[in-house]
């Protein structure tokens, strides 16, 4: 998850998009494009404040570092803090994104980037019963500032580090080759004491859940694209091969806590018990090969595309000594036809398929 301050654009691709993006939801995807260095010097600083003691700062600075406009850098950062409606819970974030662009030659460009992100506090991740909030319980309503947890046991800490590069070379013929690589490491710790229904007229039952999660992921995308003509038809062709490897380690806990008076809470309780119930490792590998041809014939635009994926999923629970595996191959396709009118109207028809392998094998 990249904070929107570091994004140059957000594009919503509606419908199946597996041909170009690989495994994805049939409903579509959200494509995020981060800010890149500019050879035009610039910068900005923003300060903000709001209710719930909200405050923060953002900055962004970019420009060339040499006289020949071969190398440019960019540094963006932000910090944010806010109280929540529940007294002990806060929201806090720190993030930094350095990036560099190097014009190695007139036809070759290298982009380097890193993203460092931490949320040491994440606000509330719980909820309260309908009976007592929306409607009264035993003639009373719970205060909207009531906190059902325990400050010593409720914790949210998220860290995310990402590095990557894009390299592109443009040939004199107009064809180009590019490679994109990203490595991501994420660590999340979430511990929570939560309400579990009414015990009596004033007290709520409580439970405990906790998880420690780490993820390492690498994605690599290689592309070749260019254009050529066959008679009256202009072709814009994209050929690619991508690869991703993702490993997710999750340890889960559950437990019990003494009940709490929802109308006159007293804090400082200790857990009745906390027990580990899982220690899982989920691994996904995917390799995809894709081809797309965008054809222009006078006012007509015809797009045809296809993609072949090989996916391997394994799930190991080292606590319960279980394992499941899944190997799957799939072909995804896309076809679209559009006509351009002089007034700008462009009716079209499109058909596409999506490939969404489950992360958990049965």
Predicted regions and their residues:
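Hydrophobic, lipid-facing positions within transmembrane beta-strands of outer-membrane proteins
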Residues: 28, 41-43, 55-59, 94-98, ...
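Transmembrane beta-strands of outer-membrane beta-barrel proteins
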Residues: 43-45, 71-75, 110-112, 177-181, ...
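Structural signature of Gram-negative outer-membrane beta-barrels, strongest in the C-terminal barrel
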Residues: 101-105, 215, 234-238, 242-244, ...
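Transmembrane beta-strands of outer-membrane beta-barrel pores
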Residues: 47-53, 79-83, 94, 116-120, ...
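Outer-membrane beta-barrel translocator/receptor signature
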Residues: 5-8, 19-96, 104-108, 161
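Acidic/polar loop-and-plug regions of large Gram-negative outer-membrane beta-barrel proteins
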Residues: 80-84, 96-103, 107-170, 183-215, ...
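Outer-membrane beta-barrel proteins
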Residues: 56, 82-88, 119-125, 135, ...
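Short loop/turn motifs that connect adjacent beta-strands in outer-membrane beta-barrel proteins
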Residues: 37-42, 66-71, 107, 172-174, ...
């Amino acid at each position: 998850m990249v904070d929107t301050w570091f994004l140059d654009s957000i594009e919503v691709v509606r419908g199946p998009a597996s041909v170009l993006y690989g495994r994805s939801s049939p409903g579509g995807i959200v494509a995020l494009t981060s800010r890149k260095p500019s050879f035009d010097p610039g910068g900005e600083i923003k300060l903000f404040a709001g209710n719930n003691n909200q405050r923060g700062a953002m900055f962004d600075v970019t420009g060339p570092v040499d006289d020949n406009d071969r190398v440019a850098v960019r540094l963006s950062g932000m910090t944010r803090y806010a109280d929540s409606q529940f007294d002990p819970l806060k929201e806090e974030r720190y993030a930094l994104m350095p990036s560099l662009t190097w014009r190695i030659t007139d036809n070759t460009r290298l982009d380097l980037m890193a993203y460092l992100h931490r949320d040491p506090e994440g606000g509330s991740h719980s909820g309260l019963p309908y009976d007592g909030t929306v409607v009264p319980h035993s003639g009373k309503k719970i205060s909207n500032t009531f906190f059902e947890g325990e400050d010593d046991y409720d914790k949210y800490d998220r860290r995310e580090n990402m590095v990557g590069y894009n390299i592109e070379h443009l040939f004199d013929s107009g064809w180009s080759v590019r490679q994109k690589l990203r490595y991501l490491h994420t660590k999340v710790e979430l511990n929570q004491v939560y309400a579990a229904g009414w015990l009596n007229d004033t007290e709520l039952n409580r439970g405990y859940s906790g998880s420690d999660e780490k993820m390492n992921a690498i994605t690599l995308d290689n592309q070749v694209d260019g254009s050529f003509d066959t008679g009256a038809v202009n072709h814009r062709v994209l050929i690619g091969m991508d690869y991703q490897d993702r490993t997710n380690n999750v340890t889960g806990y559950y437990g019990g806590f003494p009940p709490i008076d929802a109308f006159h809470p007293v804090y400082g309780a200790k857990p009745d018990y906390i027990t580990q119930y899982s220690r899982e490792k989920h691994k996904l590998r995917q390799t995809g090969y894709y081809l797309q041809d965008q054809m222009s014939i006078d006012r007509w635009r015809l797009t045809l595309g296809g993609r072949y994926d090989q996916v391997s999923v394994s799930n190991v629970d080292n606590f319960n000594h279980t394992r499941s595996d899944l190997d799957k191959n799939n072909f995804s396709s896309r076809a679209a036809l559009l006509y351009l009118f002089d007034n700008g109207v462009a009716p079209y028809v499109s058909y596409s398929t999506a490939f969404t392998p489950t992360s958990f094998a049965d």
